[in-house]
């Protein structure tokens, strides 16, 4: 038996709240309506499409892991992070990121993606870049996707954490950098190293 539009929309909302990863096709089958009807219902209820729902759930999860800066201040979109070990972000180069005359990305956007990822990977309330050694290895053009990969590689005697960031378009390296990071809270790390040395 077909449900009224109001009843279907109420159930649709409940179903998506229970399982934000359900597709429009699965919803259409569940409610015996067309995919287009589901899309119209979602629009009326201001429920985003599956991709946006997945992104929202992932960002909420990542926001809990990133302590050093608000997730919305990260340049690019963090897709994976293991605090004090590694992180990955993606950055889609759009028209506002390139020089108008040649459609090449401005370098400060690539640096900002790498630098903010180096900050985000630090598991501390405050992390600042003390020093950076960077290299641009090829031009990045409009509509290319830059994948930045950060890895914590060590710690200096002065307590600063060393983070290496390599950025790629496809398999091609386009940017590399070594970031020396100041962090405000050294007690935990110092305690860990003392335990390991005993």
Curated annotation (Swiss-Prot):
UniProt keyword annotations, A-Z: DNA-binding, Fatty acid biosynthesis, Fatty acid metabolism, Lipid biosynthesis, Lipid metabolism, Repressor, Transcription, Transcription regulation
InterPro entries: HotDog_dom_sf, Transcription_factor_FapR, WH-like_DNA-bd_sf, WH_DNA-bd_sf
GO molecular function, one term: DNA-binding transcription factor activity
Domain MaoC-like intervals: 102-169
CDD domains listed in its UniProt record: hot_dog (cd03440)
Gene Ontology BP annotations: fatty acid biosynthetic process; negative regulation of DNA-templated transcription; negative regulation of fatty acid biosynthetic process
SUPFAM superfamilies for the chain: Thioesterase/thiol ester dehydrase-isomerase, Winged helix' DNA-binding domain
Keyword Lipid biosynthesis applies: yes
Protein role: Transcriptional factor involved in regulation of membrane lipid biosynthesis by repressing genes involved in fatty acid and phospholipid metabolism.
Name assigned to this protein: Transcription factor FapR
């Amino acid at each position: 038996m077909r449900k009224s539009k109001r009843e279907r929309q109420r159930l649709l909302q409940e179903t998506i709240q229970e399982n934000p990863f359900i597709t429009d096709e699965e919803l259409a089958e569940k409610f015996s309506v067309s995919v287009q009807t589901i899309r119209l219902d979602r629009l009326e209820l201001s429920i985003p499409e599956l991709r946006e729902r997945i992104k929202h759930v992932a960002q909420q999860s990542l926001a809990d892991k990133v302590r050093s800066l608000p997730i919305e201040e990260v340049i690019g979109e963090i897709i994976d992070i293991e605090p004090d070990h590694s992180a990955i972000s993606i950055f889609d180069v759009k028209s506002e990121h390139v020089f108008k005359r040649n459609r090449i990305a401005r370098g400060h956007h690539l640096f900002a993606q790498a630098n903010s990822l180096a900050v985000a990977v630090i598991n501390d309330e405050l992390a600042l870049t003390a020093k950076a050694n960077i290299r641009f290895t090829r031009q990045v053009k409009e509509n290319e996707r830059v994948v930045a990969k950060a890895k914590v590689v060590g710690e200096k005697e002065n307590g600063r954490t060393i983070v290496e960031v390599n950025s790629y378009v496809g398999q091609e390296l386009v940017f590399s950098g070594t970031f020396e990071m100041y962090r405000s809270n050294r007690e935990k790390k110092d305690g860990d190293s003392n335990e390991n040395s005993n």
